[in-house]
């Protein structure tokens, strides 16, 4: 990301997000902008509605100042600590993604595979999460559902193409069947 684009993203996160009335997902460059604000002792940007942050371990290290080794020792506890500190649902991505809520709920996702480490997979997850929030699901439930279905769809894609052969767009065709199977 260029310096100019980083500045634009930071400005959007700092100025637009606090005035936003709905629920929001903060991912990728938005997380980097939030990390810059936190480094300057500014408050974590937050919309009026619920907020979900979706860091991978590197982004979480930048946001918290913790080392990757420290993060690996207690992923659930750290996700919960920052969910409370930021008043946001934290989706700490990685092997067995952790979803933590400010009210103390935590779940560890059983689905997914190393193929999800490929660039673009997190964008699919962020889109799924935003869609579920737009449908009216509360943030924690939307995050837990999106993470589970994202991982399950990736498991199906990996069964067809291999963990290292699958691409983010291979996840999408598997979602329709999963939604149909899990519909109430």
Q: Residue spans of the language-model regions?
A:
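Short glycine- and Lys/Arg-enriched binding-loop motifs that mark or flank ligand-binding interfaces
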Residues: 26, 90, 108-111, 115-119, ...
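Short, charged, surface-exposed loops that flank catalytic or proteolytic processing sites
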Residues: 66-75, 136-144, 162-166
